[in-house]
Amino acid sequence: MKKPCGTPASHPFLLSWVQAQAAVLGLAALAAAAAAGAMESVPKSFEIKQVTRQEAPKIDGRLDDASWQKAAVIDDFKQLQQIEHADITEKMVVYVMHDEDMLYVGARLYDSSPDLITANILRQGERMNNEDKFAVILDTFNDKRNGYRFEVNPNGIRDDALYLDTTQLQWDWEGLYYAKASRDGEGWTAEMAIPFKTLSFDPAGTTWGINFQRLIARKNERDGWVYRNRNQNPSSSGEVTGFTGMEQGLGLDVVPSVSFRQNKDHVNDTDEFKVEPSLDVYYKVTPGLNASLTFNTDFSATEVDNRQVNLSRFSLFFPEKRGLFLRESDIFEFGRLKGGDNTGNISSTFSRSTLENGRPFFSRRIGLSGSGDPVDLVAGAKVSGRIGGFNVGALAIRQDEQLTVDARNLFVARAVANVLSQSSLGLIATSGDPRSNLDNTVVGADFKYTNNTFAGGRMLEGEAWVQKSDTEGLTGDDAAWGFRMRSPNNTGWYGGLGLKHLEENFNPALGYVNRRGVNDQTLELGYTKRRPGRAVQALRSGIDIQQFNGIDSGDLESRTITWRALEAFSPLSDQLKLFYIKSTEVLEQPFQISNGIFVPVDRYDWDEVQLQLEGSASRKLSGGVTLSTGDFYTGDRWKAGGDFVWKMSPHFWLTGAYEYNGVKLPEGDFIVRLMSTRFDVMFNATWSWVTLIQYDNVSNSIAAHSRVRWIPEAGREMFIVFNHNLAEELPNGGFRSQRADATVKFNYTFRF
């Protein structure tokens, strides 16, 4: 095995800028051509009915209030999955009305076999991908770009999300709304009350985008009102007209909270008790523009990260989970450099860390040290929302001092102009480095193109972006740019092509970057065959290619070719996947892959076969298995993993996961194990208790996280949180306590 050689080449920032602008112009030209040939879907609309506050229904899930007789009625639904455009198998009727304060949505969801309704989830905010559920999609500005999604299941459990654009959802957003449901011999009914104070909208606008969806889990059937290419999102919605007289009050939410925390450090034998008050204030400057202030911000009740195994040379990505940064987070997204949830289109096999690489702003950099320990936030302010045809956002944070880093002022600003029918052109700027005392700024521009009516209803999306950082002590080679075009359709052909150029000194101190000095090139191509009514409902095959070349040398550094040989899906979404993966890594310096084991400098090519089996999560007992074997650097690797979820009842779930990597190299053999167990106890729809225990043999440590949550109603919460960390230090292989903490936290939303 020999290292490839190459000829050095220079790529100054001017050339980067010209190349990026050429990509922008190319995307714009393609956008114009696609828009000219696009087919519009058949529009649907209805006029909303208004009632008075005195007539407002009681939200109990029963649909028995007289005011529902005055509501607009929608009953013309079709399947978007299993069989697109087919008649729905179970009748569905939706009722919509509003008063001065709330939008009310009711649904009568008939079911010929009510005993078979899938309703296993009894914890607020839990994802309901495999539950019977009813969902409402709102595009309050009717601009076909962004929106809200509100869901409820037959147990009255709520879940909600923001549409960052028409292809990506932010499920960690939490909006304040009310929902209840009830079951009877004809199926189930649901009621929602969505406060206008929760939504951003134009008070002069009388027309919103709206859509409805139902999932019948046991049939894997999705029914909807308006849809395109088997999908529903703000760009493929109907319209509701006649909004008048909505009131948002003062538009002021005041959320005081207090936490009582006991910390025990067993290593240093210290004990500390803290009382931490905090305050969050949210104010609607206009119905479309929100301002917020935070003082002595407290993240003590945030869920812990799931541990991950890393056998690569580059850092992993952990998503944001803190509510302060999730509210209106869509405003700050840049260039679709986000590898999270999408709306059901084809996902590539590229790792999330490479998809996120190059983000100018990643809020997880704030309030956390490089080792992941919390850093206090003294105060913060944010303005975000929509002004005319612009989306704007600004965030300022005062972060407290930590070890050798002084207290820091951190700032990010974002402005996005809506262009074409579904596209946007934006700017971003950041200032400050939360993890050093060096000055740092980043400026960038991006163009995002979206067309979901391309070629008769196909999806076409693209983006082009450019950034430049300025870091104290670094000069030159500090730019980044990229572009990508994708047609992520879930039926027929799909494909994509992209390039990221990340120079050696590009340093977004408030962003995320785990690999620099490279050109990251991606290609994806495949085909999905739908077979309605068959035991194997869909078949897919394709190829994903990702290659990294050094910018200066042009030499190959890494390449992964994944042949998606076979992907088969049952009507209930059971999945079988067979992949053949060919990898190349070029090491220019020894790589410590495990404690005391170094892979020497050389070029390495290896092959791997991977089999994945996954059972439908709609069953009470579900899970998956992943098996792979093949070469690995100078030796070979056997990898096995599995997970299961046992929903014994809506009140008790047991979850387990195990991952094993057995690596044999001439330089040394090693095994990496990662295990986790989770217990979910749902006493009812307001009380839950979740315990997560994780272990890995790299850190040789166990972490236990237990959280009791009480939500008597939306906007009121109590948490009781226990954390305990143990390390394998005793001579007999036993574990010794490292640290433990207990927290009780209360918060209450006062809405004016």
Labelled PLM ranges:
Residues S41, N129, D143-R145, P203, ...:
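A cross-taxa feature marking solvent-exposed loop/turn segments within ectodomains of secreted
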Residues M1-W17:
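N-terminal secretory signal peptides that target proteins for export/translocation
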Residues A36-N418, G426-L427, N437:
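Structural preference for beta-rich elements and adjacent junctions enriched in aromatics
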Residues T270, D280, N290, F299-N306, ...:
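Catalytic-domain carbohydrate-binding cleft regions of carbohydrate-active enzymes
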Residues D376, T453, G457-M459, A464-F752:
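Exposed, low-structure sequence patches enriched in small/polar residues
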Residues Y104, T189, F201, D253, ...:
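Membrane-spanning beta-strand positions in outer-membrane beta-barrel proteins
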Residues W17-A33:
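Bacterial N-terminal signal peptides
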